[in-house]
């Protein structure tokens, strides 16, 4: 089967690859916008925490930095299934810190 691994909305293009284990389906980082923080926790950056990008995924360790109002999230290891438009939710152990909308993955 074929899987979508990227899209260019401006050009109306989808990029596909073959096979569920294709390395193109893995992401090492993402960019997040419209981030909202909850709880009265220190939100200074860079910040080490964990992120969950899909309902069934286990949160994975990450490092968050910020540049020009874009939150850059680097994973401790590549993960599958990151797509723009999805939510990214950040945790410190079992405490939810907040979340945002994924604008780009790589």
What are these regions (language model features)?
Residues 1:
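Hydrophobic, well-structured mid-protein blocks that either form specific transmembrane helices
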Residues 7-97, 102-106:
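Basic, glycine-rich polyanion-binding accessory segments appended to enzymes
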């Amino acid at each position: 089967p074929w899987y979508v691994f990227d899209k260019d909305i401006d050009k109306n293009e989808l990029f596909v690859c073959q096979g569920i284990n294709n390395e193109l389906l893995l992401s090492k980082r993402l960019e997040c916008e419209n981030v909202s923080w909850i709880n009265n926790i220190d939100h200074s950056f860079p910040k080490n925490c964990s992120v969950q990008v899909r309902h069934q995924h286990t949160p994975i360790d990450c490092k968050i930095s910020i540049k020009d109002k874009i939150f850059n999230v680097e994973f401790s290891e590549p993960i599958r299934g990151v797509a723009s438009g999805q939510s990214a939710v950040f945790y410190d152990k079992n405490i939810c810190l907040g979340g945002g909308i994924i604008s780009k993955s790589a």
